[in-house]
């Protein structure tokens, strides 16, 4: 019987109701299960960070809306999102997986944290900073992402481009020398990143989990992530 890797999925919370409940789509779990993994929701308890890092094969860092540190943004800008206890837990988990060279897949906010932990910088308001850019914060809108040849993302999806959804206000706009952009929107905005020094640490800005029940080429990202976790 094929080993099904255990994937830690840090839960998101509804920051609009004072952080009193976890709140996220089931599609993250469906996507991991469909790709052959066993997803487990991880709550915000510091006592289980070490256990999660040691006992789970891969980390899925999901989307969400919460405040990042000011030094993660380009000069004189700061987060417009509410504070959340998710930040220190996710940061510790991700740092643990990075240190152990275990697979990480970041989606939306998860991609942004992966980038900023490696020295990248963001803007809290993409439309204000880049008025000529596409409307990236419009639900129901789709745009093309061009994929960098030879990247982990390109190998995963087997294509040079794909059509994705787009609903994010914040965006990674400055890369460090530790990170490469493996996907960009038609307007040049960074839509996917990778950490070359890590066996499998990639992030996508769009919400691939929204396609979990569809025949979408991007779902191969989950398959590649689960396979990397199986081999970790």
Give residue spans per PLM region.
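Catalytic cores of DNA base-excision repair glycosylases
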Residues: 158-163
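Active-site glycine-centered loops adjacent to acidic/histidine catalytic or metal-binding residues
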Residues: 108, 168, 207
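Gly/Ala-rich beta-loop-alpha elbow adjacent to hydrolase catalytic centers
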Residues: 106, 110, 115, 119
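A glycine-rich beta-turn/hairpin centered on an aromatic-Pro dipeptide
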Residues: 165-169, 176
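Active-site-proximal beta-strand elements of phosphoester/diester hydrolases
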Residues: 201-205
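N-terminal beta1-alpha1 cap of cysteine-dependent amidohydrolase-like domains
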Residues: 1-105, 123, 127-141, 146-156, ...
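Short, catalytically relevant binding-site loops at active-site mouths
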Residues: 111-113, 132, 171
């Amino acid at each position: 019987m094929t080993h099904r890797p255990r994937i830690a999925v840090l839960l998101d919370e509804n920051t609009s109701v004072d952080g009193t409940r976890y709140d996220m789509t089931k599609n993250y779990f469906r996507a991991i299960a469909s790709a052959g993994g066993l997803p487990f929701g991880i709550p915000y308890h510091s006592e289980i960070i070490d256990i999660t890092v040691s006992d789970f094969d891969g980390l899925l860092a999901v989307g969400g809306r919460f405040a990042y540190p000011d030094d993660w943004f380009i000069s004189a800008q700061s987060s417009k999102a509410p504070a959340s206890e998710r930040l220190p837990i996710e940061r510790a988990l991700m740092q643990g997986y990075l240190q152990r060279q275990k697979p990480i897949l970041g989606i939306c906010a998860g991609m942004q944290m992966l980038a900023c932990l490696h020295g990248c910088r963001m803007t809290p308001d993409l439309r204000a900073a880049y008025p000529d850019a596409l409307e990236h914060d419009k639900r129901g809108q789709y745009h093309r992402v061009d994929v960098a040849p030879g990247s982990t993302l390109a190998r995963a999806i087997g294509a040079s481009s794909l059509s994705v959804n787009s609903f994010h206000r914040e965006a990674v706009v400055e890369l460090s020398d530790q990170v490469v952009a493996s996907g960009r929107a038609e307007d040049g905005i960074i839509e996917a990143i990778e950490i070359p020094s890590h066996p499998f640490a990639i992030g996508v800005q769009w919400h691939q989990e929204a396609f979990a029940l569809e025949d979408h080429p991007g779902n191969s990202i989950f398959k590649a992530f689960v396979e990397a976790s199986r081999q970790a």
